[in-house]
Amino acid sequence: MERTFLAIKPDGVQRGLVGEIIRRFETKGFTLVGLKFLQVSKELAEQHYGVHRERPFFPSLVEFITSGPVVAMVWEGDGVIASARKIIGATNPLTAEPGTIRGDFGINIGRNLIHGSDAPETAQKEVSLWFTDAELVNWQPHLTPWLHE
């Protein structure tokens, strides 16, 4: 079963959107297997955004993700990576489709509420960076047979 990493950024937490964001993934039929509420350290932020280290916006990414609490999550399900990207919407909320998280609630590209892994390799790396194996729960909701063939 495929897994992805999602993080509700400080703006999503401060605006009280945690429940709404989680609801969207639960009602889609995905299974939450890891969840933590944390203040991100500068070191973790720099590791997470390491691919952008040489980009001019890198310092602002690190500053923002460490500016307040974050909800880190691991979700599981068939096609969860691609589906999560659709649920989240385009990176820039101004171009994100209505009905997506960013389209409905996003303000601007610097305050776009949520991060989601963009590929299986990235998801695996991010899950391992943010969670230990002991922090992930292997379980199956009773409704799983009704959602998957």
Swiss-Prot record:
Subcellular location: Cytoplasm
Function: Major role in the synthesis of nucleoside triphosphates other than ATP. The ATP gamma phosphate is transferred to the NDP beta phosphate via a ping-pong mechanism, using a phosphorylated active-site intermediate.
Active-site feature positions: 115
Record GO cellular component, one term: cytoplasm
Species name: Nostoc sp. (strain PCC 7120 / SAG 25.82 / UTEX 2576)
Molecular-function GO terms, alphabetical: ATP binding; metal ion binding; nucleoside diphosphate kinase activity
Name of the gene: ndk
Keyword Glycosyltransferase part of the UniProt annotation: no
Designated name of the protein: Nucleoside diphosphate kinase
